[in-house]
Amino acid sequence: MAELTEVRAADLAALEFFTGCRPSALEPLATQLRPLKAEPGQVLIRQGDPALTFMLIESGRVQVSHAVADGPPIVLDIEPGLIIGEIALLRDAPRTATVVAAEPVIGWVGDRDAFDTILHLPGMFDRLVRIARQRLAAFITPIPVQVRTGEWFYLRPVLPGDVERTLNGPVEFSSETLYRRFQSVRKPTRALLEYLFEVDYADHFVWVMTEGALGPVIADARFVREGHNATMAEVAFTVGDDYQGRGIGSFLMGALIVSANYVGVQRFNARVLTDNMAMRKIMDRLGAVWVREDLGVVMTEVDVPPVDTVPFEPELIDQIRDATRKVIRAVSQ
């Protein structure tokens, strides 16, 4: 039995959800789980049911469907390696969505006691909260937007799976682009990308722009407060190589301004490479005065402009503000 536990614990440690956990730390949890095997189309969780269990998916995709009163269900694909069913357990509330196996699924099922074991693993409570918040936020409809060149893209808050899409997606972020963004010649690590994409939407808010409603991420923009509920936040942008020079960064700044006003951020600061002229021009429009911070690096602080200065149609401003409100309300429930 001990040998079987060690094998299962090692299998658990291989899941993306348990990144950083040693197999030995997962042995108590392994004894509390039972095997899961599901065929395509099988309902694993039903919206509205009591929350008694969670599931860890080793292989196979599942689809999470959230029924809404005023429209069709909103569907999100969840890749293997992650947990499902955690939101209702964290909130001690009925299921918030229906989960169906999209492919043959193999994994494990755990009860509330097993979930409590996970919560007591170092760092796992915060990880669970971030995942749950993002899944609630996933039920926000992407906003179709038109940039300076007349092209249409989609704007939405960052969602689960964007780490994988950025690492392995079709949109190229060249060494030069990454250098300007991260001030390093090395490709950002998965750990850094997980920090950048696993956010709380209140102190760390990220908009992404996609090619098509379900398409790849082509750009992102974020603000990160200097402390909980602080009025100062750092801003940063990344735009895929083939999408630069189209006004996407300027558009994303407008969206950040709307969201920042909503959450009470009053000043932005930015730390950029001296030759990152695209970012500097965006900040210059807000009245930036640049100060050298280090060799090849400059920084600035600017006031967050009022929303009525953003060059968007009132309807679009309302959509961005509404999406900000919904995502923050979702994660605070």
UniProtKB/Swiss-Prot annotation:
Alphabetized UniProt keyword annotations: Acyltransferase, Magnesium, Metal-binding, Transferase
Residues binding Mg(2+): E211
Outcome when changing E234A: Shows a lower rate of acetylation of USP in the absence of cAMP than the wild-type protein, but in the presence of cAMP, an increase in the rate of acetyltransferase activity is observed
Gene Ontology molecular functions: metal ion binding; N-acetyltransferase activity
A Pfam family annotated for this UniProt entry: Acetyltransf_3
Presence of keyword Manganese: no
Any one of the GO CC terms: cytosol
Source superkingdom: Bacteria
Annotated knockout phenotype: Disruption of this gene abolishes acetylation of USP.
Domain N-acetyltransferase: start-end pairs: 153-317
InterPro entries documented for this protein: Acyl_CoA_acyltransferase, cAMP-dep_PK_reg_su-like, cNMP-bd_CS, cNMP-bd_dom, cNMP-bd_dom_sf, GNAT_dom, RmlC-like_jellyroll
Activity regulation details: Allosterically regulated by cAMP.
Annotated residues for binding of 3',5'-cyclic AMP: G85, E86, I87, A88, R95, T96, R135
Residues reported in the UniProt entry to bind substrate: F237, T238, V239, G245, R246, G247, I248, G249, S250, N276, R285
Keyword Hydrolase among UniProt keywords: no
Coiled coil location: none
The EC number(s) this enzyme carries: 2.3.1.-
Cofactor(s) recorded in Swiss-Prot or TrEMBL: Mg(2+)
Assembly information from the UniProt record: Homodimer.
Annotated function: Catalyzes specifically the acetylation of the epsilon-amino group of a highly conserved lysine residue in acetyl-CoA synthetase (ACS) and of the universal stress protein (USP) MSMEG_4207. Acetylation results in the inactivation of ACS activity and could be important for mycobacteria to adjust to environmental changes.
Protein name: Acetyltransferase Pat
Organism in which the protein naturally occurs: Mycolicibacterium smegmatis (strain ATCC 700084 / mc(2)155)
Source taxonomy: Bacteria, Bacillati, Actinomycetota, Actinomycetes, Mycobacteriales
